C-alpha cells in the first residue's frame, strides 16, 4: 500500500505545475490518492483541500494522467498479484533487475535520476520533480540488445546502458517500456467501480531488428 497523499496532507497547497507533476508520479504507485486535511493551529479546518479539479488550467493534464492509470490497471493488478505470491516489489530501483550494471547503482544516487524507478519489470518511469523542467536526463539500465521503447513520441527506441535526453512537456511524464515486453491495457474509465469493460489491448514492445527472432510468453490472470 505504497503511495503519496498527492499535494501534501498538510501545509500550503501546491502550485499548479508541481501539482501536475505530483499526480503524474502518483498514478504509477499502488496507492494513488489526492486529498488533504489542513487545519489552523487550534485544530479547525483552514478551508483548503487538494482535489483533481483545484486548478482548472491544468485539469486536462491531471485528467490525462489519471486516465493513464486506469488503462494500466490490468498491468498493475498482475504486479500486485506477483507481489503477493512471489514477493516481488512493484516499485523498483533501477538496479534491482540490473544488478550487474554498475551505472544502474550509481544512478540511484545521482541527482539527475531523482524520481526514476521501474514499475514492474516492463516499465521505467522517469518522473519530473523540478519546476519549469521540460526535458530530463535519465539513465536507462543496460539490458543487452533489448533496449527501451518510449511510450510517447511514436515509440523511439533507445539502447540501454546510457543516459538519454527525454522530452518532458507538462502534459505527460516520460515513460519507457523494456524491449521484448508485453503490456495489457484496459479502456479508460471514470473509476475502478465503473470500469466494467472487459476489453483488453495487448501492447507489444518488440526486440530491435538486430536481435533476430525471439519468443515472448505472457501469463495473465484476472479474477
Give the positions of each predicted feature.
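Catalytic-domain carbohydrate-binding cleft regions of carbohydrate-active enzymes
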Residues: 1-172, 178
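Accessory, solvent-exposed terminal regions and/or long lumenal/extracellular loops of proteins
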Residues: 170-223
Amino acid at each position: 500500500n505504497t503511495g503519496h497523499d498527492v499535494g501534501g496532507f498538510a501545509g500550503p497547497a501546491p502550485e499548479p505545475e508541481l501539482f501536475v507533476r505530483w499526480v503524474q508520479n502518483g498514478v504509477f504507485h499502488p496507492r494513488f490518492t489526492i486529498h488533504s486535511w489542513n487545519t489552523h493551529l487550534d485544530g479547525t479546518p483552514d478551508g483548503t483541500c487538494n482535489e483533481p479539479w483545484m486548478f482548472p488550467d491544468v485539469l486536462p493534464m491531471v485528467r490525462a494522467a489519471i486516465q493513464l492509470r486506469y488503462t494500466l490497471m490490468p498491468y498493475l493488478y498482475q504486479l500486485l498479484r506477483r507481489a503477493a505470491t512471489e514477493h516481488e516489489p512493484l516499485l523498483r530501483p533501477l538496479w534491482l533487475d540490473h544488478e550487474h550494471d554498475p551505472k544502474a547503482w550509481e544512478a540511484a544516487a545521482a541527482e539527475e535520476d531523482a524520481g526514476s524507478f521501474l514499475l514492474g519489470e516492463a516499465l521505467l518511469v522517469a518522473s519530473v520533480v523540478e519546476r519549469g523542467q521540460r526535458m530530463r536526463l535519465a539513465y536507462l539500465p543496460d539490458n543487452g540488445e533489448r533496449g527501451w521503447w518510449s511510450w510517447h513520441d511514436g515509440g523511439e527506441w533507445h539502447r540501454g546502458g546510457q543516459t538519454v535526453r527525454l522530452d518532458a512537456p507538462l502534459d505527460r511524464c516520460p515513460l519507457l517500456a523494456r524491449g521484448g515486453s508485453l503490456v495489457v491495457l484496459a479502456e479508460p474509465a471514470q473509476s475502478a467501480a465503473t470500469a466494467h469493460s472487459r476489453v483488453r489491448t495487448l501492447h507489444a514492445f518488440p526486440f530491435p531488428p538486430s536481435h533476430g527472432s525471439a519468443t515472448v510468453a505472457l501469463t495473465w490472470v484476472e479474477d
